[in-house]
Amino acid sequence: MVSPGQKKLKLFRNDVPVREVVHTWVPGDWTHIAVQIRPMPGLKWIVMAKVWHSSELEPKEWQLAWTENVEPLPGRATAWGQPFSGTPIAVDDLRVWRID
């Protein structure tokens, strides 16, 4: 989640923040977010995330990483937002795909 007021990108697990990094939101600019979940040896999963503005190139490195010991539940991918000071949120070009 991008938190404009706190100037952070946060990764949550069941409504609990597990990782965060500094990120400055730019009003009126599109924010791109990429999240990837991959299996690791030993029945673990790594969750990685990165964020960038439409005026920037996508970062090569992941900005957040967190290891999870519980396999993700199957189901539908979702995106949600929480308006900042009543500012509307628009989600466009949401893409989800399986990485083998």
Regions found by a protein language model. Give the residues of each.
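Extracellular glycan-recognition regions
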Residues: 1-100
